[in-house]
Amino acid sequence: MSAVMITRKITRKWEKLPGKNTFCCDGRVMMARQKGVFYLTLFLIVGTCSLFFAFECPYLAVHLSPAIPVFAVLLFVFVMAMLLRTSFSDPGVLPRALPEEANFIEMEIEAANGNVLAGQRPPPRIKNVQINNQIVKLKYCYTCKIFRPPRASHCSICDNCVDRFDHHCPWVGNCVGKRNYRYFYLFTLSLSLLTIYIFAFDIVHVVLRSVDSGFVNTLKETPGTVLEVLVCFFTLWSVVGLTGFHTYLISLNQTTNEDIKGSWSGKNRVQNPYSHKNIIKNCCEVLCGPTYPSVLDRRGLMLEDSCSSAPSNGATTVPVNKSSNPATQTTKSSAPLIPNEHTPDEAKPSICSGTQKSSSSPKEEKPSSPISPNAVAPAVIKESTH
């Protein structure tokens, strides 16, 4: 016969979270799996700024002002801080329903919809809530098994429901939602200023050197400047345009997802219930509102059970604690922190209880040598065969 050995290992909850995210630094850093475009963003920003600091800043600091490279460094540090803050943070992922919660929601839906005849299409799973005298529909997510809160949506790339979902941005390698939208906007705004700043002083650098060396010779002597001008020129339009678009959305207290779907415009002409009808109030709510905590317990602890079989002569070995008096010691095992829902209730106390109800009672092996009171000795439970 064989014995079943059950081992329990303490793990972090982020290791078992569903979805298509990657975690680093013991769950503190959260990103999407597709990070190739994010690395390209880092390369373009760091590479362009490095060329600017190496070639233009020394010349401009001597001929114009030493404040030029200082301001460029401060702006570069702010851009990188906002980028990493956007990329590495939880955008507002909503936890999926537990099996018990999902079953309860299913029972509520069946009770509300009644019996659906065979062949009929079931009604849509929607709840209506009222926000500022406006009816807003809460849609049911078949993946997360929850009714999504207002303005939440399911990201198909990260496979998670995100609160106040704006869009999934591959350039930052993460979703943009309730918890990192302001940092995303500050990143695009500061990156626009940095791009304009570098582009302008690249032109100034070329003009100043052309006075002494000529325009053609200057271009030959400064190939790094030419490369910076090209990168900044083609980047400027997209970054500045993106910043302007999000400035427009913030003034209306609207998300990119709502703008694409036409939630508050179009034929119905439904008013936006989240807008304060004031640009300043909308901007203050989006950019200066409170920072919401993450609802994902990423670094929480959980027990993971793993079973393995080992050859045994009709006995199962279970670790127990030995008391100071071996003669009065009963067979015990530590109770699990997280009970196994697949274990029947009548089978759970078979080892943990002090008295056994079955006919075959556990027998304890006596140690051949004296041991300390805190030592752990195996208790052998014989399996009855008929």
Curated annotation (Swiss-Prot):
Palmitoyltransferase that catalyzes the addition of palmitate onto various protein substrates, such as ADRB2, GSDMD, HRAS, NRAS and CGAS. The gene is zdhhc9. PROSITE patterns: DHHC (PS50216). One of its GO terms (cellular component) is endoplasmic reticulum membrane. Residues 57-63, 205-224 are lumenal. It holds the Pfam family DHHC. The lineage of its organism: Eukaryota, Metazoa, Chordata, Craniata, Vertebrata. Keywords: Acyltransferase, Endoplasmic reticulum, Golgi apparatus, Lipoprotein, Membrane, Palmitate, Transferase, Transmembrane, Transmembrane helix. The active site is at C169 (s-palmitoyl cysteine intermediate). GO terms for biological process: peptidyl-L-cysteine S-palmitoylation; positive regulation of pyroptotic inflammatory response; protein targeting to membrane. This is Palmitoyltransferase ZDHHC9. GO terms for molecular function: protein-cysteine S-palmitoyltransferase activity. It is a multi-pass membrane protein. Its main location: endoplasmic reticulum. Residues 306-386 are annotated as: Disordered.
